[in-house]
From Swiss-Prot:
UniProt organism field: Oncorhynchus mykiss (Rainbow trout)
InterPro entries linked to this entry: Arrestin, Arrestin-like_C, Arrestin-like_N, Arrestin_C-like, Arrestin_CS, Arrestin_N, Ig_E-set
Identification of the protein by name: Arrestin red cell isoform 3
One GO-annotated biological process of the protein: positive regulation of ERK1 and ERK2 cascade
Keyword Cell inner membrane listed: no
PROSITE patterns (UniProt xref): ARRESTINS (PS00295)
UniProt-listed SMART domains: Arrestin_C (SM01017)
Membership in a protein family: Belongs to the arrestin family.
GO CC terms, sorted: cytoplasm
ATP-binding found in the keyword field: no
Length: 415
């Protein structure tokens, strides 16, 4: 009997402990044709609720400036999407079939618990954080999704932070099941005062890489020119397209190798170089795109963005892509060579993502659940109940991610 694993449920309470939100997960997957539904339960103290209503909002926002610069009513933030759900009293038109997890939570928490539902539009961006500099304070720039729950007589009522629950969830994408073709590119360059050319061919061993996986770059040079290749530079670059009022692109090297391999005239050269882009070696780079919130144990370089529809760029937020750049540094010769002759380079696009988990939580409608057992004390929300009934077997976990070892706690309590 004893070591049965319970269903993990994340919870967060308002500072005044009168409102608590329960969610089965923090990451919601964009499958390109649909996004996982956001379905949770909100528990409200009836003495605190009185004659008010219970609201839950979902907001997707793009913060493009430091929070400490928000002055004189100017905010460096753009809300890309806002949706409001009235959990109590329920509106008949908004009611949906409860998921199995919601039914189990409602049974466990009692009559003061109410379900809520959100459908995330497919065209919204994934959660991305731009890495702040050492001196930056406040919320980091980037795209995030926030759930906010509170009691009020109307949705327009101003709510104090102490009386509301605010928590951040993530919209994520996983690697496609069928990767694209193997990247390969080639170029030929002719030089001044040389009747023969230099040919560069570069390829990757595959198109899709997982975070932390080494990237093998195959470089083949056929140098029939009179020039000498002095050395090679291979780098992995992250490109972040910021889609706001206009589109701007930022690039940042996340891994690089410089080799003193020379290719003399009338010779060939072939070698495989290995690079591994990771966040560990890039923590000081301001503006680097990362997955989700900063200072969390599960943070890494931002995954590549897969977009199905790019017609409305204003709601795309931040689009992340990666390329490997191979550069041949050519020897200079003659008075005009420095002006007319340039180094030879090519770029290879690839995809960097997390693999799809073997088992993803699925929210399934549940029409009927046995209601013979009485609801247990709602104060008992920190431990697994001794009942071994499947409908009662929960493990509640505070809605906060684990911190990186050796790093200061994140003072933002919205996570």
């Amino acid at each position: 009997m004893g070591d049965k694993a319970g269903t993990r449920v994340f919870k967060k309470s308002s500072p005044n402990c009168k409102v608590t939100v329960y969610l089965g997960k923090r990451d919601f997957v964009d499958h390109l044709d649909q996004v996982d539904p956001v379905d949770g339960v909100i528990l409200v103290d009836p003495e605190y609720l009185k004659d008010r209503k219970v609201f839950v909002t979902l907001t997707c926002a793009f913060r493009y400036g430091r929070e400490d610069l928000d002055v004189l009513g100017l905010s460096f933030r753009k809300d890309l999407y806002i949706s409001t759900f009235q959990a109590f009293p329920p509106i008949a038109e908004e009611r949906k079939a409860n998921s199995r997890l919601q039914e189990r939570l409602l049974k466990k928490l009692g009559q003061q618990a109410h379900p809520f539902y959100f459908t995330i539009p497919q065209n919204l961006p994934c959660s991305v954080t731009l890495q702040p500099g050492p001196e930056d304070t406040g919320k980091a720039c980037g795209v995030d999704f926030e759930i906010r729950a509170f009691c009020a007589k109307s949705i327009e009522e101003k709510i104090h932070k102490r009386n509301s629950v605010r928590l951040v969830i993530r919209k994520v994408q996983y690697a496609p099941e069928k990767p694209g073709p193997q990247p390969m590119v080639e170029t030929t360059r002719s030089f001044l005062m040389s009747d023969r050319s230099l040919h560069l061919e570069a390829s990757l061993d595959k198109e899709l890489y997982y975070h932390g996986e080494p990237i093998s770059v195959n470089v083949h040079v056929t140098n029939n020119s009179t020039k000498t290749v002095k050395r090679l530079k291979i780098s992995v670059r992250q490109y972040a397209d910021i889609c706001l009022f206009s589109t701007a692109q930022y690039k940042c090297p996340v891994a690089q190798v410089e080799a003193d391999d020379q290719v003399s005239s009338s010779s060939t050269f072939c070698k495989v170089y290995t690079l591994t882009p990771t966040l560990d070696k890039n923590r000081e780079k301001r503006g680097l795109a990362l997955d989700g919130k900063l200072k969390h144990e599960d943070t890494n370089l931002a995954s590549s963005t897969i977009v199905k529809d790019v017609t409305n760029k204003e709601v795309l937020g931040i689009l992340v892509s990666y390329r490997v750049k191979v550069k041949l540094v050519i020897s200079r010769g003659g008075l005009l060579s420095g002006v007319l002759e340039r180094d030879v380079s090519v770029e290879l696009p690839f995809v960097l993502m997390h693999p799809k988990p073997t088992e993803l939580p699925i929210s399934r409608p549940q029409s009927a659940v046995p209601d013979s057992d009485p609801p247990i004390d709602t104060n008992l929300i920190e431990f697994e109940t001794n009942s071994f009934s499947q409908d009662d077997d929960f493990v509640f976990e505070d809605f906060a991610r684990l911190r990186l070892k050796g790093m200061a706690d994140d003072k933002d309590d919205d996570c």
